[in-house]
Amino acid sequence: MVATLGPGILGEARAEPTAKVVLIRNRGVLGDQGRVQTEILQSMLDEAVKTLLGTNSPLEGWRKLFKSSDVVGIKSNTWARLPTPMELEAVIKRRLLDVGVADKNIDIDDRGVLNNPVFLNATALLNVRPLRTHHWAGVGTCLKNYIQFVPNPSAYHDEGCSPLGKIWTYPVVKGKTRLNVLCALTPQFYGRGANFFDRRYVWPYQGLIVGTDPVAVDAVGAHLLQAKRVAFFGEDRALDVPPIHIMVADKTYHLGVSDLNRIELIKLGWGEEVLI
């Protein structure tokens, strides 16, 4: 299913470049007791990449993104209450190896990226993290995930983390991000206060949001969390700050498309309570 999203929280349509984002869900990816089913997750990611790149096979899509000669940093997220699932890290690494990237030229890291030789010498990055609300940024999504690439993260917390887009212009990451994967297996849709976590506001959405444009991926993710708040509370209950950094990344830093009207959202798989 293909949809063009409405304006939502992020602005009005204008005649400018568009972006493509794939949302894929599978009601079986969280098995008994919420355990991630690795092979189902692999098939979800593969189908998303194939659809995003318009290729005949998943591996052909991966080969459009990465070369065997690349040095690849997988920028994950280790926040203890809702980290990137290790199964998702594993299936990403599996496909990089399948493309022919040497094992020694692949690493997965979060808070140690500035001291990690693979990341410091990376020719390509893959950005992967869970979708959740965030005290300083409104939402914790792909743009926010690169805050560990600076030695002073707190300096980027002003005005709803509006300066986050600037990090993407620094040489350590500029132009290197080949794919953004927002893990929406169990997103957190509401929270107030620093490091807030409450399982009442986490739900088994069982999805992945995938794209080459981090701004568009984040805009879709923020829209999903907003839609869930409306469904849960009967209104869009306010966060500590609105996720204005997504629009700033578009308007000021020109990193991608924040306008939901200019995002082609391709929805695959399980459609029950898809919300957007």
Locations of the language-model features?
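N-terminal and secondary-structure boundary signal
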Residues: 1-276
